């Protein structure tokens, strides 16, 4: 490798942007083919290629940052800005769902019976499973902070314990949400109430699964001695993401479950 007189990371040529783009093409065209011709072949191929691309691309980033030392302070600064902008884009993504919900609920049309929840909809009790879910996510926010402080203090064993607990709480939340969907007295086809409820809470549930996976990778890396008290941005990004998921749930709980019922 040629000597460089700057702290920035000159990335080696990589096939992953190309395979990622092909996966995106297969996913979008595969979805259209699935809707119109009921064939899952393209969609399945796209999913497999996307998962392989994600695994290998992130594996390469771990190699570059952890083993080759390319993630210097200026590079880490860029990664931080990237994560902040990504979370900001997610905030606006959820803002769209809240907008749809409040647009429908603050001025219910005559078709809904002029009231909210619409006539004929039996809502979920916000003080049963949704309240338990809130407690579970808030507890996971505490355990992920405990993990962060343990990493910074070099407490390896405590970090592993706290991360394991956070992941278990994340999976417990997903299980409870799945049970709630199964027992719900309305479906996604029940007008604007059903669609806003299931799309908003469903996308949040998807983010919990993504966050749990992100933290599980961090746990694996922590077990393999990848993180030090100074160098652990992978974990920090996962913790930011988890706190974001936490805050979105609080807004969902107050808006859709409590006020909306």
Curated annotation (Swiss-Prot):
SUPFAM superfamilies: Cytochrome c oxidase subunit III-like. Keywords: Membrane, Mitochondrion, Mitochondrion inner membrane, Translocase, Transmembrane, Transmembrane helix. Residues 1-15, 67-72, 153-155, 224-232 are mitochondrial matrix. Its main location: mitochondrion. It catalyses: 4 Fe(II)-[cytochrome c] + O2 + 8 H(+)(in) = 4 Fe(III)-[cytochrome c] + 2 H2O + 4 H(+)(out). Component of the cytochrome c oxidase, the last enzyme in the mitochondrial electron transport chain which drives oxidative phosphorylation. The respiratory chain contains 3 multisubunit complexes succinate dehydrogenase (complex II, CII), ubiquinol-cytochrome c oxidoreductase (cytochrome b-c1 complex, complex III, CIII) and cytochrome c oxidase (complex IV, CIV), that cooperate to transfer electrons derived from NADH and succinate to molecular oxygen, creating an electrochemical gradient over the inner membrane that drives transmembrane transport and the ATP synthase. This is Cytochrome c oxidase subunit 3. It comes from Oncorhynchus clarkii. The gene is mt-co3.
